[in-house]
Amino acid sequence: MNLREDKKWAYGAGSFLRDAVGQRPLMMYAPVQTDKAAESAAEINKELRAVIGAKPLTHAEIDKIKASRVRALPGSYETTGAVLGALSANQLYGRPDDYVQTLKARIEAQTDAAVQAAATQVYRPDALTWVIVGDLERIEKPVRALNLGTVQVLDADGKVVR
C-alpha cells in the first residue's frame, strides 16, 4: 500500500503464497515507474524487515487481511471448474473433504499472534530472489547499489548476458 498510496509510484502492489507440495513460493509484485524501480525495491525490503522486526502487523491490518480473504471465498467457487480445482487441491495437499466448508471459520479464528508468527516464518528478506524488469540503462546502477544480492542481467529469452 505504501508504494501506491503514500509514494504514488505504483498503480498497485501485492503478494501471495502459491500452493505447493513442499516449499511454497512467496511472490510479491509492484509494477512501478521506471525511475522508482530501485527505490521501490528498497521500500519493499524495508517493509518486510519491519514486519518481522520493529513494526509487526497491527490488529487492524490483520483484521483487514482476514476480512478480505473471507469476502473473496464465494467468488473462489463460482464455476464448476473452480469447484473441481478445489477438490483436486484438497486431494493433492491432503486436506479433509470439508476443507472449503470450514475455511471461513479457520480464517476468522486466526489470532494476531499466529499471523505474526507465520509472517516471521515466511518473510525471509535475506533469502529472496529479486526479479526486477525495466530499462537496463536507467535502473541497473541504482539496483546494484541496493546490494540485494548477486545481480544477473538476462536477455528476453532468459539467457544470462552478464
Question: Which residues does each predicted region cover?
Answer:
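M16 family metallopeptidases and their MPP-like homologs
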Residues: 1-53, 59-112, 120, 125-133
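Proteolytic maturation boundary segments
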Residues: 112-120, 124-162
